[in-house]
Regions:
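Acidic/polar hotspots within intrinsically disordered regions
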Residues: 2-4, 19
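FNR/FR-type flavoprotein reductase catalytic core
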Residues: 118-263
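Short, surface-exposed secondary-structure boundary micro-motifs
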Residues: 86-88, 137, 277
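Local cysteine-cluster metal-coordination motifs and their immediate loop/turn environment
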Residues: 237, 259-289
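Cationic, amphipathic, low-complexity segments that mediate targeting or membrane/lipid association
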Residues: 7-13
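Ferredoxin-reductase
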Residues: 42-128
């Protein structure tokens, strides 16, 4: 979820700062509303220090960060963080990054970042000890079943697998059975498999057959062998649409975490709107990023 914007300057003047602007928005939009429920979750703007840095594969960086003081607030699976890019005057807008994992024992927040634009490439240069100003937790996350024993299929592709790790952990702690179905072009694209294994069974597809079954996630044999109580997915839109269509065909409720381009992260700039089935447009950053797919216009 990256969004680049041209930098506006006036000769002889300082670069306009959006920090005060975003702080004001934070106060105005702390109440997050969704169609069926209203969730009050306090938002924070604070510096987090990088405690560990890992490179899961070329072009990706895993930052494990912790508050300089205090403890991490409650964070729901599927929510995201807006990071201020340091020392990068051409990227004054924050970058939205999905929450990969929350380790409350170590007081760490994990963010898996794909370095594809100026902002994320700068973030990929961060080192242990660096501090990043973060606004979090933002958006609405995945639905946790109200009763235990539910079997939930978590389908991810590419960097879209990132939020499913924390969701899987949360499901397991809630007494549910998470089952992971992860897809990539090659086996190299599949990251954090050892972490996923701690929380549930893993099934894999690759387009070149280098790992798991060959093909797309919707071609995997597990979909015909087992029944699931619900499905949650995150990844490239074509993949999520295919998963949503499969779920609809077998009568299983499905949620998707959208990765629309975002800027403010609070529903003010309207650059991340998504058309709903009823014709209305909703801000992905505020009303989502997780939506029940039967509310989206995908299946029309």
């Amino acid at each position: 979820m990256n969004y680049d914007c041209a930098l506006f300057r006036k000769s002889g003047n300082k670069i306009f700062s959006f920090d005060a602007f975003t702080r004001k928005l934070l106060c105005n939009f702390a109440l997050t509303k969704i169609k069926q429920q209203t969730i009050f979750m306090k938002k924070y703007v604070k510096d987090l220090q990088i405690a560990e840095v890992e490179i899961p594969r070329e072009g990706y960086i895993l930052l494990k960060m912790q508050p300089i003081d205090g403890i991490l607030p409650e964070i729901m699976p599927g929510q995201f963080v807006e990071i201020q890019v340091p020392d990068s005057p051409t990227t004054f807008l924050r970058r939205p990054i999905s929450v990969n994992f929350v380790d409350y024992e170590k007081n760490q927040l994990w963010l898996l970042i794909h370095a594809v634009g100026d902002g994320t490439k700068r973030l990929a240069q961060c080192q242990k000890g660096d501090k990043l100003n973060c606004m979090f937790p933002l958006g609405n996350g995945f639905t946790i079943p109200e009763t235990d024993g539910k079997k939930v299929l978590l389908v991810g592709g590419g960097v879209g697998t990132a939020p499913l790790l924390y969701f899987g952990k949360t499901l397991r702690e809630a007494g549910c059975e998470p089952v992971f179905l992860l897809g990539g072009r090659t086996g190299i694209d599949l990251m954090q498999l050892q972490d996923f294994e701690q929380y549930g069974r893993i099934y894999v597809t690759t387009e070149d057959a280098s790992m798991g079954e060959k093909g797309f996630v919707t071609n995997h044999s597990i979909l015909t062998k087992e029944k699931f109580d619900s499905v949650s997915t995150c990844g490239p839109k074509p993949m999520m649409v295919a998963v949503a269509r499969w779920a609809a065909s077998v009568g299983v409720p499905c949620e998707a975490s959208l990765e629309n381009l975002m800027a403010c992260g609070l529903g003010a700039c309207l650059c991340c709107v998504e058309k709903m089935k009823d014709g209305h447009n909703l801000c992905v950053c505020k009303e989502g990023p997780v939506f029940n797919t039967d509310k989206l216009s995908w299946l029309d």
